């Protein structure tokens, strides 16, 4: 197991340098898997860039994946049984149901939830809570600290009520896309795809706590982990091992 960082300003060629290295190594080590993890919006473009750069007929041992696709790929490989995954649309529908059921317990937000886009905003907030490991107990602390700001405290109380109602509704029936990474983390050691592989993380400005936990576990399973890091303009682009 090794961890490497490639530092450089935006546009300095970090990705190009790493991709060239990965393609060369993939050709020299056909029995090793190379996984490049990028944000969702960059997967297609990264695949296209690699194919254009490749001087072979294909790149069979290189996979370009998002965190979500990595989760699907590995859980399918190891046969982990999981509950249906609730996507953003599903979350919004569940929240609409929960909000209707709990309307009397939502003095600050109850009359606003029918407005266009409001459920979407609540869903986004709850998604971030789950990504960053914020529990209803953590929200109690936020509510306490906001007591002197009456309107904010009331909205936080309502948001906590919706968050708890959402969790109660999906418990034992669904998992969210955020939770799939924790399911994946517990299954990594069973994966033959990941064992001895090289994993690259490129294009990220940072990682959530759930993603950090996954990366830590990946480092125990994979042979090598490489992370590109954007730094300020004017600083040297260095590759640290």
Question: What are the functions of these language-model segments?
Answer:
Residues 1, 31-33, 194-197, 222-224:
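A general structural motif
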Residues 3-29, 33-47:
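Glycine-rich P-loop/Walker A and Walker A-like loops and their local beta1-loop-alpha1 context
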Residues 22-24, 208-221:
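Histidine-anchored nucleotide/phosphate-binding helix
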Residues 31-141, 147-150:
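Conserved P-loop NTPase-based nucleic-acid remodeling module centered on helicase motor cores
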Residues 63-70, 198-207, 211, 226:
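Conserved helicase core region in the C-terminal RecA-like lobe
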Residues 2-6, 10, 14, 101-203, ...:
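Accessory N-terminal region flanking or inserted into the helicase ATPase core
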Residues 240-241:
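Conserved small/polar residues in nucleotide/adenosyl-binding loops
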Residues 224-235:
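Conserved phosphoryl-transfer catalytic core
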């Amino acid at each position: 197991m090794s961890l490497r960082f490639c530092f450089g300003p935006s546009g300095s060629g970090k990705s190009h340098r790493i991709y060239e290295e990965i393609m060369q190594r993939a050709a020299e080590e056909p029995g090793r898997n190379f996984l490049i993890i990028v944000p969702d919006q960059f997967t297609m473009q990264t695949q296209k860039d690699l194919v254009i750069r490749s001087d072979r007929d294909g790149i069979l041992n290189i996979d370009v994946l998002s965190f979500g696709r990595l989760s699907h790929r590995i859980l399918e490989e190891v046969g982990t049984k999981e509950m249906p995954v609730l996507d953003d649309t599903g979350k919004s529908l569940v929240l609409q149901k929960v909000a209707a059921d709990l309307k009397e317990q939502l003095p600050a937000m109850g009359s606003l939830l029918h407005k266009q886009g409001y459920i979407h905003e609540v869903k986004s907030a709850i998604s971030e809570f789950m990504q960053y490991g914020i529990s209803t107990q953590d929200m109690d602390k936020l509510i306490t600290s906001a007591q002197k700001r009456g309107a904010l405290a009331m909205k936080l109380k309502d948001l906590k009520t919706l968050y708890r109602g959402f969790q109660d509704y999906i418990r034992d029936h669904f998992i969210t896309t955020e939770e799939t990474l924790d399911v994946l983390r517990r299954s990594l050691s069973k994966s033959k795809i990941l064992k001895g592989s090289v994993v690259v993380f490129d294009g990220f400005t940072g990682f959530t706590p759930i993603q950090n936990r996954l990366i830590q576990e990946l480092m125990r399973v994979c042979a090598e982990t490489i992370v590109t890091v954007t730094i300020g303009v004017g600083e040297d682009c260095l590759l640290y091992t």
